[in-house]
Amino acid sequence: MIELSLIDFYLCFLAFLLFLVLIMLIIFWFSLELQDHNETCHA
């Protein structure tokens, strides 16, 4: 039971980290897209 709960906690933690990284990448890509659009519009 203890090993299973530790494995479940580890998997949940990994999933949470992957989710955070995915959100960071999306925000980073979105900010880059906004910068590109602003540059093209002003130019």
Curated annotation (Swiss-Prot):
Membrane-spanning residues: 9-29
Localization annotation: Host Golgi apparatus membrane; Host endosome membrane
Membrane topology: Single-pass membrane protein
Keywords from the named record: Host endosome, Host Golgi apparatus, Host membrane, Membrane, Transmembrane, Transmembrane helix
Residues of the signal peptide: none
Single Gene Ontology MF annotation: identical protein binding
Record-linked InterPro entries: NS7B_bCoV (IPR021532)
Record GO cellular component, one term: host cell Golgi membrane
Statement: the UniProt record of this protein carries the keyword Membrane: yes
Full protein name: ORF7b protein
Organism per entry: Severe acute respiratory syndrome coronavirus 2
